[in-house]
From Swiss-Prot:
Classification via HAMAP family: Thz_kinase
Source species of the chain: Klebsiella pneumoniae subsp. pneumoniae (strain ATCC 700721 / MGH 78578)
Protein name stated in the entry: Hydroxyethylthiazole kinase
Organism superkingdom: Bacteria
Pfam families noted in UniProt: HK
GO biological process: thiamine biosynthetic process; thiamine diphosphate biosynthetic process
Name of the gene: thiM
Amino acid sequence: MPELLNPAPVAHLRHLLRAHSPLVHCMTNDVVQTFTANVLLAVGASPAMVIDPREAAQFAAIADALLINVGTLTEDRAVAMRAAVEHARQAGKPWTLDPVAVGALTVRTAFCHELLALQPAAIRGNASEILALAGMSAGGRGVDTTDTAAAALPAAQALARRLATVVAVTGEVDYVTDGERVLSVAGGNPLMTRVVGTGCALSAVVAASAALPGDRLENVAAACGLMKQAGAIAARQGGPGSFIPAFLDALYQEVQG
């Protein structure tokens, strides 16, 4: 039975982000790079977008955490991502997988399954992506989910147990599990789905949280809670055009205020 996330882990995550300011190596998609960087800065982390295959592996060992987001995957980018993950592992740095549109497209599906053998510290995806990654579904409609997070929870638990990782399946309610414990995170606002990049940016905050000390399950769930709280505040502006700056302001005020 999922346990509702209480406010204490979110408050603790705010403190940890301020205290540690983790450097997050974001190998993310072209559509969301600026927004992702701004979200990380707003929560007190430090972003870097190093993608060249000649540099990515070296930087992965320097950063505190690595994010792999396959949204705009290319052959060269896959080479760089694979090398970065391998070097992050060798350096003992946690890496997070965002399996964008897995199941819907064959190349990225095969690539993400290959990366699973390299032990991600956390996985963050929508319901259809998590179901596909666990081998329980063919995937959603491109980057959009066709399933509910609750329906994908058994797949998330199975994936977490198999890989000894933390899996966050996000939607109207987010579920975060290590295979045994399950935390549910309510809140947010539907406007979060009407702008590009909130899920991808969440994955970056998850990556940052995975690098922090303490209970990784609670840290990842708190990252989801932090984003949902900011989304609910920003939605008071009334539309997607004003949502993004209000969202960044809300995140900053939550963590730094």
